[in-house]
From Swiss-Prot:
CDD domains: AAK_G5K_ProB, PUA_G5K. Pfam families: AA_kinase, PUA. It catalyses: L-glutamate + ATP = L-glutamyl 5-phosphate + ADP. Substrate binds at S54, D141, N153. Belongs to the glutamate 5-kinase family. It comes from Syntrophotalea carbinolica (strain DSM 2380 / NBRC 103641 / GraBd1). The lineage of its organism: Bacteria, Pseudomonadati, Thermodesulfobacteriota, Desulfuromonadia, Desulfuromonadales. It is found in: Cytoplasm. Disulfide bonds: none annotated. ATP binds at K15, S173, D174, T215, G216, G217, M218, A219, T220, K221. This is Glutamate 5-kinase. Keywords: Amino-acid biosynthesis, ATP-binding, Cytoplasm, Kinase, Nucleotide-binding, Proline biosynthesis, Transferase.
């Protein structure tokens, strides 16, 4: 099964964690060199590769005398400002022997939440790939604030699969996949070779927190796999410090854990709405509206809304909740909060009478709406 699925892959997003390329003495140039040679081998076989590389903060924090994780965002930003150039230099030097050039792309969540900037970033990415350049993506930690953080590069790598229109996500970790218990403390822990569907039990099994040098534990990796597989992209979590790990994976060796893509996956736009675009508000709806949206695939009309929370404009994402406040959908609002306060509970035929204009009958059109599974 794995070999058959991998035979259809053309474009790969490879996420490299801090725990893989960072050792006791700083950046592990031997590992970076080994991974670069692996990627060059894939490129020579006709694959396209997008690299998501952590390590900027871990590389730069030593210059500031920081032990462990930087405790504040300003310290993290300062460490990233020092470390990002060194990280890129390491990748540049590692790819040079095989005649490959690298290009840096730094992103914040806002870059992907804004559809125009998302498409601009995609155009840049596609141009780099067209010219045989290896894009190296990282979060723009020097300018990011809490509200627009990706949180970790596992999450960023999952969103990059949509940005890059990739066929496969490989997350290189310091653990060789998902186990039924922590393999670092339980030698008898059993590894899962294939996960067909990421259930709540699987998510709970991942558990755990990040390491001293990184922010992403197994829980964030499984969450990233869930986001990628919902877009139809298979995901492999594997030990990135194994020699020749990438060519071995693409040859079909049963390394790590393979999370299978969801057969009925989201469109690119709905994946963007669901995961890239941050919610600015909340709409509480009655049971009739909930059934229409969640069970019948209808648009959300103003008549079913009875309460509004948050501050949002037309075009912002909002969460849609039932009467008890449980989120069951997310979508893009066709009207601002101020406008909705005037038309909620009314029939669509009254919108133009109340506002003096009308963008449409729907508060959230079904084409701009994602129901939570």
């Amino acid at each position: 099964m794995r070999k058959d699925l991998l035979s259809q892959v053309k474009r790969i997003v490879i996420k490299v964690g801090s725990g893989v390329i960072f050792g006791q003495d700083g950046l592990d140039l031997d590992v970076i060199g080994s991974l670069s040679r692996d990627i060059c081998a894939l490129l020579s076989q006709g694959y396209e590769v997008v690299l998501v590389s952590s390590g900027a903060v871990a590389t730069g924090k030593g210059e500031l005398g920081i032990v462990g994780r930087p405790p504040t965002i300003p310290l993290k930003q300062a460490a990233a400002a020092i470390g990002q150039s060194r990280l890129m230099r390491a990748w540049k030097d590692a790819f040079r022997p095989c005649g490959r050039c690298v290009g840096q792309i730094l992103l914040t969540r806002d870059d992907l939440a804004n559809r125009r900037r998302f498409l601009n970033a995609r155009n840049t990415l596609m141009t780099l790939l067209e010219y045989g350049v290896v894009p190296v993506i990282n979060e723009n930690d020097t300018v990011v604030v809490e509200e627009i953080r990706f949180g970790d590069n596992d999450n960023l790598s999952a969103l990059t699969t949509s940005l890059a229109e990739a066929d496969l996500l490989i997350i290189l970790s310091d653990v060789n996949g998902l186990y039924d218990s922590n393999p670092k403390t339980n030698p008898a822990a059993r590894k899962f070779s294939v996960i067909e569907r990421i259930t709540e039990d699987i998510e709970q099994m991942a558990g755990g927190a990040g390491s001293v040098v990184g922010t992403g534990g197994m829980a964030t990796k499984v969450e990233a796999a869930k986001r990628a597989t919902l877009y139809g992209v298979g995901t492999i979590i594997v030990d990135g410090r194994q020699a020749g790990v990438l060519p071995k994976l693409m040859a079909g060796e049963e390394l790590g854990t393979f999370f299978l893509p969801v057969p009925q996956h989201m469109t690119a736009r709905k994946h963007w709405i669901s995961f890239s675009k941050a919610s600015r508000g909340k709409l509480l709806v009655d049971e009739g509206a909930r059934r229409a949206v969640a069970e019948k695939g209808k648009s959300l009309l103003p008549s079913g809304i009875f309460s509004i929370e948050g501050k949002f404009d037309r075009g912002d994402a909002v969460r849609i909740c039932d009467a008890e406040g449980r989120v069951f959908a997310k979508g893009i609002a066709s009207y601002s909060r101020q406008e909705l306060e005037r038309i909620m509970g009314r029939n669509s035929s009254e919108i133009e009478v109340v506002l003096g204009y009308k963008y449409g009958d729907e508060v959230v059109h079904r084409d701009n709406l994602v129901v939570k599974k």
